Amino acid sequence: MCETMDFFERYKNLKEKYEEKKTKPKVIVVGRSNVGKSTFVRLMTGRKDIRVGKKPGVTLKINEYDMGEYILVDMPGFGYMAGLPKKVQEKIKDEIVHYIEEHADEIAAAVQIIDTKSFFEIVERWKGRGEIPIDLEMFDFITDLKISPILVANKMDKIKKEEWDAVLDGICEYLKCQPPWHQWKFIVPAILKEGKGIEEIKKKILERVRLFKKLRGIE
């Protein structure tokens, strides 16, 4: 949650551990299925062979891409995945959690992508069942591990422009971050299918990667 995000202190405390093991930091990409993760990875890497589909669950394994200063890690989408038994979906979710826990000390940032249009409906549906909404659970999980988040509010084209601030403020409230959203530098509104927001995301990634490396003495 926002009130506990002391990422600078985490970076500083881990510097000694990285005196000998000077590996490239990782930047993970997480989100529910069908929120635009594959589109984001294509924009970041320039690779055209990354599948982008309308059916949830196109990415079913963890893929790593060397971005020069860091490794971009594309995680499978969590939640509903088309054509997969629930047992398999749960197994994939467990693998995501295990990977993040196992590599937490190597992760400079986590890019969490949400579908802004459906976010509120899905969160309320899960809460109505007495369950923790999976988007909120993932955000809490990332920040509890003191991993610096970058929350990409994708598909903003489906929101009226005059409603953007109110919608993003509402997301802040669900994340237990006091509005207005502008004060939280980790939130980036985006329309990834049009490439809008990608440069701001790249900038935030590099800021976190370079701080991460500086505090660990990684060249």
UniProtKB/Swiss-Prot annotation:
Short name of one Pfam family: MMR_HSR1
Residues holding GTP: 31-38, 57-61, 74-77, 154-157, 189-191
Keyword Metal-binding: yes
SUPFAM superfamilies membership: P-loop containing nucleoside triphosphate hydrolases (SSF52540)
Keyword Translocase appears in the UniProt entry: no
Binding residues for Mg(2+): 38, 59
Single GO molecular function: GTP binding
Keywords: Cell cycle, Cell division, GTP-binding, Magnesium, Metal-binding, Nucleotide-binding, Septation
Assigned protein family: Belongs to the TRAFAC class TrmE-Era-EngA-EngB-Septin-like GTPase superfamily. EngB GTPase family.
Function: Necessary for normal cell division and for the maintenance of normal septation.
HAMAP family assigned to the protein according to its UniProt record, in alphabetical order: GTPase_EngB
Protein name, UniProt field: Probable GTP-binding protein EngB
